[in-house]
UniProtKB/Swiss-Prot annotation:
Natural source organism: Sus scrofa
Domain Globin: 1-149
GO CC field: cytosol; mitochondrial matrix
Name under which the protein is recorded: Neuroglobin
PROSITE patterns: GLOBIN (PS01033)
Native organism taxonomy: Eukaryota, Metazoa, Chordata, Craniata, Vertebrata
Location within or outside the cell: Cytoplasm, Cytosol; Mitochondrion matrix
Top-rank taxon, per record: Eukaryota
Length: 151
């Protein structure tokens, strides 16, 4: 990824980061539409959610959304040197495997991320911006996959 892509990512993230919980909720609502089988993986205090809406409104899950948005923020901040996040992201991959997330679900998360960005940014979400974010997410997933695979 080159400097122009880095700037597209940073510029677009500024708009999203003003309301991370709102936009993170859009991301996860889309994820549950794409992969409803992920919903049972989210349990807090032995509570099983009856619907995506039930999950998306729970304080515990809202905290999870905040954490995910912080990880995205860290990737944006370190876009020029993602290797600095390598160990952290590998650890996230291990954690996701431990709770039953399939490696293939990372693809649906990527689709959901792009969907959220498109909804948030509207016409400023250009093909070049989409491509830059796809590259960034691909690098994040590559690091998480290493952890998921036990590397």
């Amino acid at each position: 990824m080159e400097r122009p892509e880095h700037e597209l990512i940073r510029q677009s993230w500024r708009a999203v980061s003003r309301s991370p919980l709102e936009h993170g909720t859009v991301l996860f609502a889309r994820l549950f539409d794409l992969e409803p089988d992920l919903l049972p993986l989210f349990q807090y205090n032995c509570r099983q959610f009856s619907s995506p809406e039930d999950c998306l409104s729970s304080p515990e899950f809202l905290d999870h959304i905040r954490k995910v948005m912080l990880v995205i923020d860290a990737a944006v901040t370190n876009v020029e040197d993602l290797s600095s996040l390598e160990e952290y992201l590998a650890g996230l991959g291990r954690k996701h495997r431990a709770v039953g997330v399939k490696l293939s679900s990372f693809s649906a998360v990527g689709e959901s991320l792009l969907y959220m960005l498109e909804k948030c940014l509207g016409p400023t979400f250009t093909p070049a911006t989409r491509a830059a974010w796809s590259q960034l997410y691909g690098a994040v997933v590559q690091a998480m996959s290493r952890g998921w695979n036990g590397e």
